[in-house]
């Protein structure tokens, strides 16, 4: 870098500008995806329903699937309300 370009400033090349923009977009999408509910949860809930209903009669409302974020971990929580065996 020359002394003159230090004061005037260099014009960034379009490739480096595009790369910076892409990095910002990717970081934004990744952070947004973590905050929202994963898109596989409804399918997971239906598949659990299909497997469990082979053995026990339950309704779809009896299965709750949730993802919680704790620090750097994602916890998948599955709650299944089984009918009384009486």
UniProtKB/Swiss-Prot annotation:
Family annotation (InterPro entries): MinE, MinE_sf
UniProt KW keywords: Cell cycle, Cell division
Gene Ontology annotations of biological process type: cell division; regulation of division septum assembly
Entry keyword Cell cycle: yes
Gene3D superfamilies from the UniProt entry: Cell division topological specificity factor MinE (3.30.1070.10)
Signal sequence range: none
HAMAP family: MinE
Family statement: Belongs to the MinE family.
Annotated function: Prevents the cell division inhibition by proteins MinC and MinD at internal division sites while permitting inhibition at polar sites. This ensures cell division at the proper site by restricting the formation of a division septum at the midpoint of the long axis of the cell.
Designated name of the protein: Cell division topological specificity factor
Organism the protein comes from: Albidiferax ferrireducens (strain ATCC BAA-621 / DSM 15236 / T118) (Rhodoferax ferrireducens)
Lineage: Bacteria, Pseudomonadati, Pseudomonadota, Betaproteobacteria, Burkholderiales
Gene for this chain: minE
């Amino acid at each position: 870098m020359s002394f003159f370009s230090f004061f005037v400033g260099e014009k960034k090349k379009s490739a480096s500008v595009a790369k910076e923009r892409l990095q910002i977009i990717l970081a934004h999408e990744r952070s947004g995806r973590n905050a929202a509910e994963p898109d596989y949860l409804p399918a997971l809930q239906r598949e659990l329903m299909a497997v469990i209903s082979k053995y026990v009669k339950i309704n779809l409302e009896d299965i709750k699937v949730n993802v919680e974020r704790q620090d750097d971990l994602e916890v998948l929580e599955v709650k299944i309300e089984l009918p009384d065996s009486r």
